[in-house]
Amino acid sequence: MIPYFLLSILGLIVVYSTTSATLIEEGKSAFQLVRNQGIFWIASLILIALIYKLKLGFLRNGRLIFIVMIVEMVLLALARLVGTPVNGAYGWISVGPVTIQPAEYLKIIIIWYLAHRFSKQQDEIAVYDFQVLTQNQWLPRAFNDWRFVLLVLIGSLGIFPDLGNATILVLVALIMYTVSGIAYRWFSTILALLAGSSMLVLSVIRFVGVEKFSQIPVFGYVAKRFSAFFNPFNDLAGAGHQLANSYYAMVNGGWFGLGLGNSIEKRGYLPEAHTDFVFSIVIEEFGFVGASMILALLFFLILRIILVGIRAKDPFNSMVAIGVGGMILVQVFVNIGGISGLIPSTGVTFPFLSQGGNSLLVLSVAIAFVLNIDASEKRAKLIREYEGQTSVTL
């Protein structure tokens, strides 16, 4: 919990630093967004306390998972039909002063869903080969999960479009399949298909041209991201403006940064400085040394979560914990890849540091599940040791 508290408090500081100047210029309170973030953090702490005390056996109920996923699908549909567009993408539902982003919650639901399915079918997954899987009735029972995940991902990308969360969902699902005990040849086949598909899409976009690709109604928003990725300096006043200023922010920071609150780029130059590109401002203010220390703390948290999964004896617990660790790890790499130009910018927030109550709630709930799993596994270990000692005595 210590890394979680440190990162959450640091997140509040960063949110204030990246938003206060702009809010003051707009005639608003400098504490408006950090206050909202603080409210979500308090709600997150309450959820963590409640989830930690629960017995998580009910999570293995297939009917409950089905109901939750139906509710999620309804929320996703509502987000597209009546949601508020942000930067060309739909995915937010406004309920009074609160804004709900259903796609954020889909990440933890996918982990829960796949952990439940594969924890019940590990033996079958490990022994079936490609030929049997394509002919046997077992396929719809387990690998229908993969089809369902793909359907959700394609729908998310095509309907909103939400390239960032779609990318995270693909990679998290891949991690879940990896830890499920799937045969290596199946894993390598899926990985090769994903890599090949990604290269094909990039090649087609490059060959056809971003301008023509952007004329497709569904992919206009995505095309702008790819345009900036290929060469942000070709359109500094348009699609490349955000990425180019991200570069400037990181260069300004140098080794030790300009100091907390002294960022230049956050003062109207770098759009979304408090969300997608918050880590660029972190580098500008704390420098590469300070940013590296923050990453080290975050990776320490991820490692602890993954170790809980590795040590867990229960397959369901193991896959949930590793899935949560993988989710945070993927989100970090996708965000840093986007702000540094290694991959197209996808609108993914940086864990704990970006302003966004939905993201913080999802991270907190996920960590609460891991804390509960860790405690239950330790209790189970003590029971096994006690029973072992009792049997030896008898």
Which residues does each PLM region occupy?
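Hydrophobic alpha-helical transmembrane segments
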Residues: I39-L47, E285-I305
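Loop-to-helix entry and N-terminal half of a specific, functionally important transmembrane alpha helix
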Residues: L307-T346, L353
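Alpha-helical transmembrane segments of multi-pass membrane proteins
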Residues: W41-S44, Y105-A115, L169-A173, A296-F299, ...
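Structural signal for the C-terminal ends of transmembrane alpha-helices
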Residues: I46-G57, L114-D123, L174-A183, F300-G309, ...
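Hydrophobic alpha-helical segments of polytopic membrane proteins
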Residues: L64-I67, R147-G155, L163-S214
